[in-house]
Amino acid sequence: MFKATIDAYLLKDSIETLSVLVDEARFRISPEGVVVRAVDPANVAMVSFDLTPEAFDDFEANDCELGLDLSRINDILGVADRDDKVQMELDEESKKLKIQIGGFSYTISLLDPSTIRAEPRIPQLELPAEIVLNGKDLQKAVKAAEKISDHMLLGVEGESFFMEAEGDTDRVKLTMTRDQLIDIKPSQVRSLFSLDYLSDIIKPASKSNEISLHLGNDFPIKINFSIANGKGTIGYLLAPRIESD
């Protein structure tokens, strides 16, 4: 059993955090909320998605697993106005999801969860540096780097966080000191990452006033932030590109 009502734009923003990496996902639903763990097809990035019942106006659920085509959900949410609510109900007999939004009534077929890639095991990593900053600051650096290169170096020197991109002829670097950051736990680290992935991840992350980056040396980066007015959390894990000598 699953029946819920939620703000349309809140749901749209939440789905975006997943759809930047995957086209379909298994949604584990329980009385404790909604959980998704997914990895992109190239095994480069993972996403952890948790939404509590408090993110919803109404939420009733037993343990169940739904397979959803995210592009289909995004298409449906595209008709929503800012103040619309989305009502969802699982028809257990037909195995379809009924959605009501802005006067529209949809009935969509669910994907068989067994045909969707299994949840990844999220590795436990010891990453010594932590940087907390506004999502807009990371977005600015990514946009500047995209004009120069297809990868970006992130690191910490002393008590400053830097983001750097270098192409064949040009180079750009943004340095943020402790007083320009929300917080920093410094450690001498640096890792290189694909801008294709960072650009996708920053789309939802840039909407957050506070994102947390965890870095090591040539290690994956963890990018964490809250969604749904603090009633949900997102965590990305992005593998590094190893620098050649």
UniProtKB/Swiss-Prot annotation:
It holds the Pfam family PCNA_C. Gene3D superfamilies: 3.70.10.10. The keyword DNA-binding applies. Transmembrane segments: none annotated. CDD domains: PCNA. SUPFAM superfamilies: DNA clamp. Keywords: DNA replication, DNA-binding. One of its GO terms (molecular function) is DNA polymerase processivity factor activity. GO terms for biological process: leading strand elongation; regulation of DNA replication. Homotrimer. The subunits circularize to form a toroid; DNA passes through its center. Replication factor C (RFC) is required to load the toroid on the DNA. Belongs to the PCNA family. Sliding clamp subunit that acts as a moving platform for DNA processing. Responsible for tethering the catalytic subunit of DNA polymerase and other proteins to DNA during high-speed replication. This is DNA polymerase sliding clamp. It comes from Methanococcoides burtonii (strain DSM 6242 / NBRC 107633 / OCM 468 / ACE-M). The gene is pcn.
